A protein has these predicted regions:
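A generic structural signal for nonpolar/aromatic side chains embedded in well-ordered alpha-helices
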Residues: 17-18, 61-62, 116
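A short mixed-secondary-structure module that forms the rim of ligand-binding clefts
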Residues: 42-77
C-alpha cells in the first residue's frame, strides 16, 4: 500500500468491515477490460458467499477464469469544506483476492444462502424449496489475500 499511515492491520477492524458492510464488488477478468459487479454477500470463516442467476455474463466469465478481485467499503461519509480541494471522504475499505468456487451440492447451497441471509439479519427459520435452489448459483470465495485502508476517522 502506497500510504502506510492509512493501512489497517487490526484484524478486529477488518472483520468489522467484512461483517457489517452490505455490498461487495467483484472484478472478473474479461477479454479486453475487467468486468465489475456489485453483489449482496455473506461472510463466514474468511470466506465470502454470493448468489446469482444460473445464466449471465458474470457466471460465464467465472467459468473461464475464477480468479477475482473484490472490494468492500464501509462507513463512508463525504466531508465538505469551504475550500473545494479540501473536501474529503472518511471510509474504511478493503481489497482482496481469491478464486471463486461454484457450489453444486444442494446442502452446501443452502448453507451458503443461510450465511448470506444471516449477514443481512435473518438468522433463523430459513426455508428454501428445491425449485428455488435449482434456479440459482451459489459462489464461495475463500479470501487468499487482502489489504484494508482507513481514510479519515472511518467510523462514522
Amino acid at each position: 500500500m502506497h500510504k502506510k499511515d492509512k493501512e489497517v492491520t487490526d484484524k478486529q477492524v477488518i472483520e468489522e468491515i467484512l461483517t457489517k458492510s452490505e455490498i461487495c464488488r467483484i472484478a472478473i477478468h474479461d477479454t479486453e477490460y475487467p468486468y465489475i459487479v456489485p453483489l449482496n454477500y455473506g461472510y463466514c470463516d474468511n470466506t465470502l458467499y454470493f448468489h446469482s442467476a444460473t445464466i449471465g455474463k458474470k457466471l460465464d466469465l467465472i467459468r473461464i477464469n475464477n480468479k477475482v478481485c473484490f472490494e468492500i467499503e464501509y462507513s463512508s461519509q463525504i466531508i465538505q469544506h469551504e475550500e473545494s480541494c479540501k473536501w474529503t471522504t472518511n471510509y474504511l475499505s478493503l481489497i482482496g483476492f481469491g478464486e471463486i468456487e461454484i457450489i453444486d451440492d444442494t446442502f452446501d447451497k443452502k448453507k451458503g444462502l443461510d450465511i448470506i441471509m444471516s449477514h443481512y439479519g435473518k438468522t433463523t427459520n430459513n426455508v428454501y424449496n428445491d425449485t428455488q435452489i435449482n434456479n440459482l448459483v451459489i459462489f464461495k470465495l475463500p479470501i487468499t489475500g487482502l489489504t484494508a485502508k482507513r481514510s479519515g476517522n472511518g467510523d462514522n
